[in-house]
């Protein structure tokens, strides 16, 4: 919510979201909404089924695969004459059901040169994941067979998910920008024992490699505890990797 400028948070002035705002201005803006499960896969399963996680059976990302035999929103719409599609992140450890067309990222998906799974194969696609998902979504919309049929499209972007790797054209976009801190950045935990007991270790839970883009060397023992370089540097072409490291080297 803080990241969408339509809600008026100060971050929205630094990084506005005009296209999302337009959807709100022309449609509806939810003021009292909540997320029943903030983890990516379970949240997606809840949206698909309209059920809480303990009811739809997908409670964590590394659980058994989502049960695609149960009733879902796309199945209902498909049965009522809608053309259905899902493009982008899926991460439900099972193939999509209820969709006439699907093209999903492999597992969590990669930011650079990601692998896409379709009904027939898994293929590596050169490019930045946000650009590719947008491109394939537009191609599906333009190439729909039933132009007069209603459609239901789920476009799931990877880029809201850590490790927040920008497109190369954005490496220096906010280099000299100071972002306002959220109100609870320096929260007070006195008298809140349960909150104190939650994992608060910055290195373990924040992943400095993910969030600060600090790479100490691909052969460093510290990489055993830092999943960030292995998460996407390996999918970059050698020249892409060099440009990325050069962009952050001086800042680190």
Where is each model-derived feature located?
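Formylglycine-dependent sulfatase
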Residues: 1-252
């Amino acid at each position: 919510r803080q990241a969408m400028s339509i809600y008026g948070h100060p971050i929205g002035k630094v990084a506005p979201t005009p296209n999302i705002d337009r959807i709100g201005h022309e449609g509806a803006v939810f003021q009292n909404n909540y997320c029943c499960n903030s983890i990516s896969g379970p949240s997606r399963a809840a949206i698909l089924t309209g059920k809480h996680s303990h009811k739809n059976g997908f409670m964590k990302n590394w659980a058994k695969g989502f049960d695609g035999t149960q009733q879902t929103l796309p199945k209902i719409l498909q049965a009522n004459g809608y053309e259905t599609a899902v493009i982008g992140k899926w991460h439900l450890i099972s193939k999509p059901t209820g969709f006439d067309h699907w093209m999903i990222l492999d597992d969590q998906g990669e930011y650079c040169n990601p692998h896409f799974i379709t009904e027939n194969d898994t293929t590596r696609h050169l490019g930045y994941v946000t650009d590719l998902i947008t491109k394939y979504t537009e191609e599906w919309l333009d190439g729909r067979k039933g132009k007069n049929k209603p459609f239901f499209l789920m476009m799931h972007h990877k880029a809201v998910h850590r490790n927040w790797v920008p497109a190369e054209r954005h490496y220096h976009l906010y280099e000299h920008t100071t972002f306002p801190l959220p109100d609870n950045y320096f929260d007070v935990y006195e008298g809140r024992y349960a909150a104190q007991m939650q994992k608060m270790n910055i290195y373990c839970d924040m992943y400095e490699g993910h969030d600060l883009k600090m790479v100490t060397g691909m052969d460093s023992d510290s990489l055993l505890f830092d999943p960030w370089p292995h998460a996407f540097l390996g999918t970059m072409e050698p020249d892409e990797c060099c440009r990325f490291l050069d962009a952050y080297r001086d800042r680190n």
